[in-house]
């Protein structure tokens, strides 16, 4: 029931939006983990190949706008907010903005759809830390379940894959969230 909520909150990882953002972003992501500077520079080189920009923030903006439009087309007038774990707009800032706007109850959609510590529980911890940073005026946040195995998500993913494979006689498909260093993959 949409009347239970004052807003929807999209929660994402975040990503750099310019070459100048890359190293500060990576330092934020790896904060407290003692990742060698050389490794950060290696990862930064991956971003350099794409102009120092992660596509994630643009994709989340497009999703936010499409979701707001879809809700309005169905007669649901809920603002759609967005907060990231690791880069602007940061989750604590978004939580503070929602509190300032008088928003009391939020439905959060974590855009990492699979279930693991970093894609599920850590986001819950991030949401709670953001609430704590705001204090008593912070909205109550309910989270939508991980959606990796939701039948409609699976069907949409299968449809996109089928469309992408048109014209290939045969293909091998590997599913991955992102790359990992070869040294980690080797064990």
Put a short name on every predicted segment.
Residues 1-187:
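Active-site-proximal alpha-helix that buttresses catalytic centers in soluble enzyme cores
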